[in-house]
A protein has these predicted regions:
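Positively charged n-region of N-terminal signal peptides that target proteins for export
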Residues: 1-4
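Bacterial N-terminal signal peptides
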Residues: 7-16
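An N-terminal assembly and electron-transfer interface module characteristic of large anaerobic redox
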Residues: 25-324
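Sec/Tat signal peptide C-region and signal peptidase I cleavage site
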Residues: 20-23
Length: 324
């Protein structure tokens, strides 16, 4: 009889505990989270961007500031890889918005000034495959940059190698002519100018600048191919900052767009700008989680309107808005 009473008490306790546990679960829902790794520690890139999505009801999980790069600190990519693997497994993570520049070079400025080997940066880029394989249910929204081409040394803002302050305008003009030659050809006068610039710009400076660009182009091409062949990313965007309608940035963008053309704009884009792309990617992640498709209608003022080409862009503002 005593045994029977004990069993009845245990059964009653179990019946009482289950609703309590269910009520506790309802009372403390897991907050939906988005992992966000910005391309540097500037507020416009990190905290201000994250705050927008926080106000939409999400917890935005961002690495400690000391892991993010700045103008003085090029960043800590290997530590960021450790951080993302530790944090992406948190309960409630719905998506990850990640700067490839941060994960490969340490930061946006790091992508412009690094001295890493091609093998090293491609090895870091390949770790996206491992991340996707380990967490296949977390969509990866990855954004990177196509290296910029400032018009002058002064316009570079100390974010290019030191020689760019002296030869920046010449390097810009040299790449303008390279790009134009591919698109529409050069006049005899432009051909002579091109040959003159090749003699004027120190060979070691041009080799360093173009060599770094070649490595960064290889990384961007590698990321596109990860998307094409393996579907590693849910969405991939490459931004273009500080360039012109004819420039090395425009040339590389044309080539990369061709590599990823078959993916379509719902999976891959190159677009004008870079600092705003993180917010675009976070917004895309939120809209897709909520299955919402917002529509935005733009009206331009009198004048050139949509045909205006901003001073630091390679395309009409109307094209930039449509791509966004």
């Amino acid at each position: 009889m005593r045994r029977l009473i004990q069993l009845l008490c245990i059964a009653m306790l179990a019946v009482w505990i289950q609703p309590q546990a269910a009520d506790a679960a309802k009372a403390e829902p897991v907050t939906e989270k988005i992992i966000f790794i910005p391309h540097d520690s500037r507020p416009i890139s990190s905290t201000q961007t994250a705050d927008v999505v926080t106000k939409a009801g999400y917890e935005v999980v961002v690495p400690p500031t000391e892991l993010l790069g700045s103008r003085e600190d090029l960043g800590h990519p290997d530590q960021l890889w450790t951080w993302v693997h530790e944090n992406i497994a948190q309960p409630g993570v719905k998506a990850a918005v990640i700067s490839s520049d941060a994960m490969v070079y340490g930061s946006l400025v790091g992508s412009r000034k690094h001295n890493e080997s091609r093998a090293q940066i491609l090895a870091r880029a390949s770790r996206f495959t491992e991340l996707h394989r380990a967490h296949p249910k977390v969509p990866l929204y990855v954004f990177g940059s196509i290296m910029r081409t400032p018009r002058t040394g002064e316009a570079s803002g100390h974010e290019e190698p030191e020689y760019y302050r002296r030869y920046g305008a010449d390097i810009f003009r040299y790449t303008l002519l390279r790009d134009k030659e591919e698109v529409e050809g050069l006049s005899r006068r432009e051909r002579k100018e091109y040959e003159f610039l090749m003699r004027l710009i120190p060979k070691e400076a041009l080799t360093d600048w173009m060599g770094r660009r070649e490595k960064n182009y290889a990384v961007n091409e590698f990321l596109i191919n990860l998307m094409r062949k393996n579907g590693t990313f849910h969405y991939l965007a490459l931004g273009r900052d500080d360039n012109a309608p004819f420039s090395q940035t425009h040339l590389e963008s044309r080539h990369l767009a061709a590599v990823g053309a078959e993916l379509g704009k719902t999976r891959f884009q190159t677009m004008a700008g870079i600092d705003e792309i993180a917010l675009l990617m976070l917004t895309r992640a939120v809209n897709e989680q909520r299955h919402e498709v917002p529509f935005v209608f733009v009206r331009y003022n009198w004048g050139r309107g949509a045909d205006t080409v901003p001073a630091y862009s390679d395309e009409k503002i109307g094209t930039s808005i449509n791509d966004a």
